[in-house]
Amino acid sequence: MNVSNRKTVSAAAILLQALLLASCLLPVRPFDEQRWWAQVESADPALLYAPHREDGRYFNPWMPMEKGFRDFLRWQLSERTLYAPEEEKELLDVLLDLSDRIRSTPGDFIAWIGHSSFLIRIDGAYWITDPIFSERALLPKRKTPPGLSLDVFAALPGKKNVLISHSHYDHLDSESIRRLPADTRIYVPLGLKALMNGLGKQDVVEMDWWQTVSCGDRCQVVCLPAQHWSRRITQNTNTTLWASFLLVSSDRKIYYGGDSGYFIGYREIGRRYPGIDYALLPVNAYHPRWFMYYAHMDAREALDAFRDLEARYFIPTQWGTFRLGDEPVGQAPSALSKAAQFSDTDPARIIVMGIGQLLPLGSRDPK
């Protein structure tokens, strides 16, 4: 990290500590789940295809975001959602020797590196989603180490491919991108190519929602909508796009949801791209609901998205590494288990991976 970045992080850390010292000044704001559900249901699906950039800024035309920095400050100055001590202490074990298991596993697989970073091998090609190997995502510090080192990933044979969903620091880590092999091909939403070039990566494919590009023989990448937003210290709010992706090969389809709130787009994606095998969907940073509801999904909404996509299996992402909301980093499995019972979801279709776990995809039924 260079000197200017260290100063920026230090200033941000001081501000955050001041906010934390002043916390608990405001009560928890109530949230009307039924009203939110009605708002989602009333959105016009045609707007998923509408223009989504105006005056240099991107937006979600089916439901523009209303939350802003003032709401963030209120969250920081509010009472925190309370959890049991055992929930607060629950952390994931990291499985060792992933590199050895990669070498000994034939065929396709999905391996979890941590947070939203997954290593995927399809038809001999390697893909990684939103790689972050750094100790911090700007401010939040890792609770668990990565299940694979960046050096091991770089040493894997063949060309590497990366999917970047948006510009937030827990999904776009500059140091990790900079250290990738120079010939890594990187797929990004609109507006992020210049940043990738500045980090030393020239093989960059910039994509808009609903755009499909070839990634080789019998391989396609589809850029799809998500309900989120973007900002970095060096970039203004929403000057770059956010997205989810569908990776299509001759044998299977893998959907990577990036970061998103629940929205009508999941139904349209499931309708347009039937037969999704694995849906990698985020379950993190959902408390407090009054602040997080628009851009993040809780366990129930993640299962609703899984149902809308009509995918065969659901793999939860974006948990277990960084504490970004009020909820503990290890809460996702228990929250999903409860939500699955409530929604009558077959638990066999939910694959909760461990950090460093490798899931072979040779069989149509990974169980």
Regions found by a protein language model. Give the residues of each.
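Cap/insert and terminal regions of metallo-dependent hydrolase folds
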Residues: 25-43, 52-56, 161, 185, ...
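Catalytic core of the metallo-beta-lactamase
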Residues: 117-121, 215-277, 293, 297-301
